[in-house]
Amino acid sequence: EAGEECDCGAPENPCCDAATCKLRPGAQCAEGLCCDQCRFKGAGKICRRARGDNPDDRCTGQSADCPRNRFY
């Protein structure tokens, strides 16, 4: 929703403050295939294995989202 940085949920979420729906201090992300322990996974980390002859999808290091490669 508008103004939220992360989905409010359980209070014990280490990345997201359930009261404010904002990322906790030092957190870059709260969820996503390219988010690991509240931080973006490094550029080039595989986030989705390829099917067929297409290459694997890899994290950019700048987002928690796993971008689809251009070959699909």
Swiss-Prot record:
Q: Where in the numbering of this chain does the Disintegrin domain appear?
A: 1-72
Its chief place of residence is secreted
Q: Which Pfam families does the UniProt entry name for this protein?
A: Disintegrin (PF00200)
Under SUPFAM superfamilies, the record lists: Blood coagulation inhibitor (disintegrin)
Question: Highest taxon of the source?
Answer: Eukaryota
Q: Which Gene3D superfamilies match?
A: Disintegrin domain
Write out the ranges of the annotated region (Disordered): 52-72
Sequence motif Cell attachment site, residues: 51-53
PROSITE patterns, A to Z = DISINTEGRIN_1 (PS00427), DISINTEGRIN_2 (PS50214)
A GO cellular component annotated for this chain's UniProt record is:
extracellular region
Record-annotated disulphide pairs? C6-C21, C8-C16, C15-C38, C29-C35, C34-C59, C47-C66
**Location within or outside the cell:** Secreted
Q: Cite the record's tissue specificity text.
A: Expressed by the venom gland.
InterPro entries to which the protein is assigned, alphabetical:
Disintegrin_CS (IPR018358), Disintegrin_dom (IPR001762), Disintegrin_dom_sf (IPR036436)
Oligomer and partners = Monomer.
So what family is this one in? Belongs to the venom metalloproteinase (M12B) family. P-II subfamily. P-IIa sub-subfamily.
Q: What else is known?
A: The name colombistatin has been given to this protein due to its source species B.colombiensis, which is a synonym of B.atrox. The disintegrin belongs to the medium disintegrin subfamily.
What this protein is reported to do is described as:
Inhibits fibrinogen interaction with platelets. Acts by binding to the glycoprotein IIb-IIIa receptor (ITGA2B/ITGB3) on the platelet surface and inhibits aggregation induced by ADP, thrombin, platelet-activating factor and collagen. Also inhibits T24 and SK-Mel-28 cell adhesion to fibronectin with IC(50) of 4.4 uM and 33 nM, respectively.
Q: What is this protein called?
A: Disintegrin batroxostatin
